[in-house]
């Protein structure tokens, strides 16, 4: 199975998982959208990473889908979100851990096609250790990010 097939399958599984749990059934309905990779409009976010909104709006009630492109060696300190999310690794390898402190021993390497969950209010952290990584996030807003202070 090709990497593209794995990523497509993983994205479908993530969407079906959210739908089955009722997460996509609440809030404003999605508008019809058909977007090719060339049509994505990437915007530099506050952390220097690039983001593109595919559907919905994370700041509003209802389903949303966006992608983030992490630069090589980007580390995101522990943080959490008020909503639950399912994340698919579209390209690259992302190292993901759960907990309130950034702990390299808790990281798991997730290559393209992998999926991880971000339960509501569950602290987690990521590292694009080996190079650029693109993820796709599916959630049910409204959403936000709360950073966790790190012990020295």
Segments (PLM) and residue ranges:
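Bacterial N-terminal signal peptides that target proteins for export
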Residues: 1-11
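N-terminal signal peptide c-region/cleavage motif recognized by signal peptidases
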Residues: 20-22
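Double-stranded beta-helix
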Residues: 31-33, 105, 125-152
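Conserved short histidine dyad/triad with adjacent acidic residue
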Residues: 64-81, 110, 119-120
């Amino acid at each position: 199975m090709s990497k593209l097939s794995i990523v497509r399958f993983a994205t479908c599984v993530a969407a079906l998982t959210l739908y089955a749990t009722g997460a996509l059934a609440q809030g404003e309905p999605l508008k019809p959208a058909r977007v090719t990779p060339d049509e994505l409009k990437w915007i530099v976010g506050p952390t220097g990473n690039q983001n593109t909104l595919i559907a919905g709006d994370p700041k509003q009630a209802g389903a949303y889908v966006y992608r983030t492109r992490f630069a090589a060696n980007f580390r995101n300190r522990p943080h959490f979100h008020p909503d639950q999310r399912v994340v698919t690794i579209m390209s690259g390898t992302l190292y993901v851990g759960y907990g309130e402190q950034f702990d390299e021993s808790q990281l798991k390497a997730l290559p393209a096609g992998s999926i991880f969950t971000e339960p509501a209010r569950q602290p987690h952290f990521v590292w694009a250790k080996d190079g650029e990584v693109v993820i796709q996030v599916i959630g049910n807003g409204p959403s936000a990010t709360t950073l966790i202070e790190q012990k020295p």
